[in-house]
UniProtKB/Swiss-Prot annotation:
Its EC number is 2.1.1.221. Residues 73-98 form a coiled coil. Residues 113-310 form the SAM-dependent MTase TRM10-type domain. Gene3D superfamilies: 3.40.1280.30. GO terms for cellular component: nucleoplasm; nucleus. GO terms for molecular function: tRNA (guanosine(9)-N1)-methyltransferase activity; tRNA binding. PANTHER family: TRNA (GUANINE-9-) METHYLTRANSFERASE, TRNA METHYLTRANSFERASE 10 HOMOLOG B. Keywords: Coiled coil, Methyltransferase, S-adenosyl-L-methionine, Transferase. It comes from Bos taurus (Bovine). GO terms for biological process: tRNA N1-guanine methylation. InterPro entries: MT_TRM10-typ (IPR028564), MT_TRM10-typ_sf (IPR038459), Trm10_B_MTase_dom (IPR047911), tRNA_m1G_MeTrfase_euk (IPR007356), tRNA_MeTrfase_TRMD/TRM10 (IPR016009). This is tRNA methyltransferase 10 homolog B.
Amino acid sequence: MDWKLEGSAQKTESRVLQEHEITLDDPGEDGVSESFQLLQIDVGCEHWEQETLPTGSAAWCSKNVQRKQRHWEKIVAAKKSKRKQEKERRKANRVENSGIYPQHSKRFLRSLIKERLLEAKHSGPRLCIDLSMTNHMSKKELSRLAGQIRRLYGSNKKADRPFWIYLTGFTTDSPLYEECLRMNDGFSSYLLDRTEEDCFSLFPLETLVYLTPDSDHALENVDLNKVYILGGLVDESIQKKVTFQKAQEHSVKTARLPIQEYMVKCQNGKNYHSEILTINQVFDILSTYFETQNWPEALKKGVSSRKGYVLRNSVE
């Protein structure tokens, strides 16, 4: 009897323990299940929020986000506008470079340019770039001068009546020559004369006219019997009268562009007025005058308002 009661008690205890274990296990499984349900609810909510978020609505965007969006749209619009302007500029350049022969090939145009330049060598006006003053120029100044030579040559190729160009005092072992090769594609094939001689020994002195802003004499016209000299000098320290003094040392005539005769000073924020121009700007003026025989038109092309000068008739 006692054994039966003891066995029954053991069975009852075992059943209770099993039920207790099951009870302990069930909440764990329910807890995990509940956690999965919560995660599913969160994901569902996030998915619902994404689906129901009204795109572009100010109600769902902060002012900062809207401001950044407007800023980005402005940048994109500006880039599109810039690309369009660049495309139009290239198109205009192609038309300009082709001159009155837009229907002809590039090969024909190159042949035409070559023919004009070689004709200028025999019967056109002559321009000499005096490069004998580059020994003390910095690399930055040499780079700027090389760029000016490139632009000058480019303008001369486009001209209907080009000049024949001489680069004097120019040696192939000079830093300037290396800079010209580095910066200017096809420089070694430029149709112009390069020589180590200086301009004063290359031409008769009576045929030379040194163009310098320090001269007292204004240039009246472009004479085919003269050789016009431009000082190949880029000097950030702005030493005054360097080219004028060099011309005087060799007893060569000087002249300045007639800026004072056809232009007047204008007011600007910096109260800045200067007649000092780059060699390519001076050349643009000479070339335009030679084609048009009109100083106001020529000066307008080469002297920008940033120099502090405007044409007289524009203020009268």
